[in-house]
């Protein structure tokens, strides 16, 4: 089976600043390995992370009129109507490749024609780890001061709405595949999510309150589970699934 690895370093805001509340897009150096081939570029790593998350469930084929996987820039965040997804418009330069789903595998096609096949599970691990590293950098910096402009504000809101939804879905699927417990934090409390089978029994345990909730299936878990006094499904965009334990 093939190899896919992706890492980012030298993370910074515009002008190589360590912090900038006005810059919404994170930049840095990205190295991505496909088998024995390594591609490197400096680009907008926040856009890279979101499009990696998109490819957990969707194909992305290289196209001249589409953003690259490592775009040199990401000028505009274009939100959909209900602010659940965003498209990023950037420069016409960057590093790109195609990501194609084939059952339980992912096939990558590079501009050179080289192809690499990896398991979807391994791909999820890499994508979620990359996204987590980018999100941690955002969280360690000053909160963003989004301008009053509705277009920009909606784009930024939609960016994080889509990010959190896709990250959570990816982590939950990985947990189902591996049978391992998930950790999440919300409003300063720490929770642990575990399950027995795909649709058998889900449980939510709060470390601080020692409260244990049990639900017969994933759908019921999302519809009925409570975080504090709010339903899990109503808080999904704000939940931070931290890791698989």
What residues fall within each predicted segment?
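N-terminal "first-domain core" detector
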Residues: 1-49
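Short, exposed beta-strand/loop patches in secreted or surface proteins that constitute
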Residues: 23, 31, 79, 96-101, ...
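Short polybasic amphipathic segments
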Residues: 27-35, 88, 98, 106-109, ...
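Short strand-coil-strand connectors
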Residues: 33-35, 82, 89-94, 185-189
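Negatively charged, low-complexity tracts enriched in Asp/Glu with abundant Ser/Thr
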Residues: 38-77, 165-185
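Acidic, aromatic-enriched beta-alpha/helix-loop junctions
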Residues: 41-69, 197-234
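An exposed acidic His-Trp-rich patch
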Residues: 66-119
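Mixed-charge, glycine-accented linear interaction segment located at domain edges/termini
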Residues: 102-167
């Amino acid at each position: 089976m093939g190899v896919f690895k992706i890492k980012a370093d030298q993370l910074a805001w515009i002008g190589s600043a360590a912090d900038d509340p006005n810059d919404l897009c994170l930049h840095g150096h990205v190295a991505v390995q496909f088998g024995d081939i390594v591609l490197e570029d400096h680009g907008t790593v926040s856009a890279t992370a979101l499009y990696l998350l998109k490819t957990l469930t969707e194909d992305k084929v290289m196209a001249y009129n589409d953003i690259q996987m490592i775009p040199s820039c990401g000028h505009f965040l274009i939100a959909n109507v209900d602010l659940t997804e965003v498209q990023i418009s950037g420069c016409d330069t960057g590093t790109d490749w195609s990501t194609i789903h084939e059952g339980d595998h992912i096939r990558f096609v590079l501009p050179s024609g080289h192809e690499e096949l990896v398991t979807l599970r391994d791909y999820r691990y890499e994508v979620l780890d990359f996204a987590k590293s980018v999100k941690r950098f955002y969280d360690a910096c000053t909160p963003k001061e989004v301008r009053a402009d509705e277009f920009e504000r909606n784009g930024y809101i939609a960016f994080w709405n889509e990010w959190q939804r896709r990250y959570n879905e990816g982590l939950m699927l990985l947990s189902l595949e591996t049978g391992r417990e998930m950790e999440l934090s919300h409003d300063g409390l720490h929770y642990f999510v575990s399950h027995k089978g795909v649709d058998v029994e889900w449980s939510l345990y709060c470390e601080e309150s020692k409260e244990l909730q049990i639900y017969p299936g994933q759908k019921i878990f999302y519809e009925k589970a409570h975080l504090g006094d709010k339903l899990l499904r109503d808080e999904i965009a704000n939940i931070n699934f931290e890791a698989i334990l």
